[in-house]
Amino acid sequence: YYRLDLRKVFFNSHLGYERRRVALKVKSRERVLIPFCGVGPYVVPVAAAGARVVAIESNSEACKWMTDNARLNRVEDNIDLIKGDALVVADLLNIRYPKFDRAIIPTPYGMDRVLDIFSHLVKKGGAIHFYTFKKKHQIEGLIEKYENAGLEVEFYRSCGNVAPGVCRWVFDLVKG
C-alpha cells in the first residue's frame, strides 16, 4: 500500500509488474541499495522480503511519503533512508556501509552515468537492476558497453514507451 500526493511527487503506476519481478529476486538479509527511491515503490517490497535497504532520495516530500509508506507496510526497521543527492551521497556510502549485494537503480532520464558510480558500491557477483531510457536500436551497443565494463547482462526488456520511439528498459546485470 502506498500513500502519496501526485502534485508533489512522481509515481509510475505502470511499473507494478516490474517492481514485483525484482522484489521476488531479493533474498532475506540481502543488503540492497536503492538510489532515487521516491515514495518507496521498490523499497517497500524489497524490505518486506527481508532485505536491509539503504534508500536515497533528494525530494523532501517524497522522503516524507516514503517514511509513511514504510510505516504503513511495517517495514521501517529494514530501511535506512538518506535524504540527499544520490550522486553526492554515493561517495559517503563506501565509508559507512560495506559493499551491497544488490542495487536497484530507477535512473532518472538522461542520467546513465550513475551506473558506473553505483556499480562500484556492489560486491563482485552482486546484482544490479538498472533502468534507462533508450531507443531499441541503441540496446545492442549498451549490452556491449556493459559487458566491457565487467557487468554481465543476464536479462533485459522494455518496460514501456515513454515517448515516440523511446522506451524505459531494465537490465539485470551481475558484477564480475
Region spans (language model):
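Rossmann-like S-adenosyl-L-methionine
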Residues: 1-176
